[in-house]
From Swiss-Prot:
Substrate binds at residues 93-97, 147, 190, 217. Homodimer. Within each dimer, one monomer is responsible for RNA recognition and catalysis, while the other monomer binds to the replacement base PreQ1. GO terms for molecular function: tRNA-guanosine(34) queuine transglycosylase activity. Residues 248-254, 272-276 are annotated as: RNA binding. This is Queuine tRNA-ribosyltransferase. Its EC number is 2.4.2.29. Gene3D superfamilies: Queuine tRNA-ribosyltransferase-like (3.20.20.105). Belongs to the queuine tRNA-ribosyltransferase family. Pathway: tRNA modification; tRNA-queuosine biosynthesis. Coiled coil: none annotated.
Length: 376
């Protein structure tokens, strides 16, 4: 078993990259989609199912896990991998995004952020050092720096202030992380929708010589072209021999286009959240199972899929479950959606290897635009 953390670039097609992130707990095939296991569970899914779908890594949320059950308790129980029965790599976010969203419950300064728990109102302080300590107690394989994510739109001065403080926090996180063989700490590029700030952030983080780099503060309501424009500014500045992670993204369309701009890793709650609300992602595009047109449709979502939820259950039954608010409906659609996301990533990787990513993008988007088959 390797004791090192490394990124191997295996192929490229334009700016799209096919690689591997090698860790002691397993290899992450990139481009990769990481299902979100916020509180130690990918909602509505058994982790055995998530594993069988082809996920090489999942994400855990530092903010939620530090509040309940508590990082120290997880450590006493053997770490997050043992606690949730997941032997493959885990990435933990820093908790910063959730804390920053508690605008009425938190106070921010150079030392960190003090906030009230949304669970019981207890007061907590999270510094860059404490964030890394918590992630260490959880035992994750990839840990994220604490950063300040400014909601867009925002004034340029406010975006710049938050970006500069995030850079100082990145330096403190690097010191706190130290040298942990087989593990990595990623820095997070900030700068809102201002190209010069994105470039400044990426250059400064590159100089820290971290093991990986994330792009944060995007997919927060700005137009897709703005997000892609920020990737155009950011990715060329980041080291080619380190993985690039676009945080919180996103839709299949976002992923497809972001890969073409040089991104290697993604995470988003969209597959499971959408599933719980009756939405299915398929190669025909997005299907709303709440719609009455599915009430007597005996076809599955996609008979060619290898996922049982996609292949074996009729749309009429899925429609019935969703309209009846049965939990099984959300479970089956979450299963379908995560299966589709992993199938999409497998197709992306294969297309890059074959040097036909542009064609793959066009074919995939054409399938979405063509849409679902006519109702029976």
């Amino acid at each position: 078993m390797t004791e090192t953390f490394q990124f191997k670039l295996l192929a490229a097609d334009g700016n799209a990259r096919r690689g591997e992130v090698v860790t002691p707990r397993g290899t992450i095939r990139t481009p990769a989609f990481m299902p979100v296991g916020t509180v130690g569970t990918v909602k509505a899914m058994y982790l055995d199912q998530v594993r069988d779908l082809g996920a090489d890594i999942i994400l855990g949320n530092t903010y939620h896990l530090m509040l309940r059950p508590g990082a120290e308790r997880v450590a006493r129980l053997g770490g997050l991998h043992k606690f949730i029965r997941w032997e493959r790599p885990i990435l933990t976010d820093s908790g910063g995004f959730q804390v920053m969203s508690l605008s009425s419950l938190r106070k921010l300064n150079e030392q960190g952020v003090t906030f009230k728990s949304h669970v019981d109102g207890a007061l907590y302080h999270m510094s860059p050092e404490r964030s890394i300590e918590i992630q260490g107690l959880l035992g994750s394989d990839i840990q994220m720096q604490l950063d300040e994510c400014v909601a867009l739109p925002a004034e340029p001065d406010e975006i710049e202030r938050a970006m500069e403080m995030s850079l100082r926090w990145a330096e403190r996180c690097k010191v706190a992380f130290g040298d942990q063989p087989g593990k990595a700490m990623f820095g997070i590029v900030q700068g809102g929708d201002i190209p010069r700030l994105r470039e400044r952030s990426a250059l400064a983080l590159r100089d820290l010589d971290l093991k990986g780099y994330a792009v944060g503060g995007l997919a927060v309501g700005e137009p897709q072209e703005v997000m892609l424009g920020m990737l155009d500014v950011t990715c060329p500045v980041l080291p080619a021999d380190k993985p690039r992670y676009l945080m919180g993204v996103g839709t299949p369309d976002d992923i497809l286009k972001s890969v073409a701009h040089g991104i290697d890793m993604f995470d988003c709650v969209m597959p499971t959240r959408s599933g719980r609300h009756g939405l299915a992602f398929t190669r025909y595009g997005r299907i709303n199972l709440r719609n009455a047109r599915h009430a007597e449709d005996t076809r599955p979502l996609d008979e060619q899929s290898s996922c049982p939820a996609t292949r074996d259950y009729s749309r009429a039954y899925l429609h019935h479950l969703i309209r009846s608010n049965e939990s099984l409906g959300g479970m089956l659609l979450s299963w379908n959606n995560l299966a589709y996301y992993q199938e999409l990533m497998a197709g992306i990787r294969k297309a890059i290897e074959e040097g036909r990513y542009t064609d793959f993008m066009a074919e995939t988007m054409e399938g979405w635009q063509r849409g679902d088959l006519p109702p029976v």
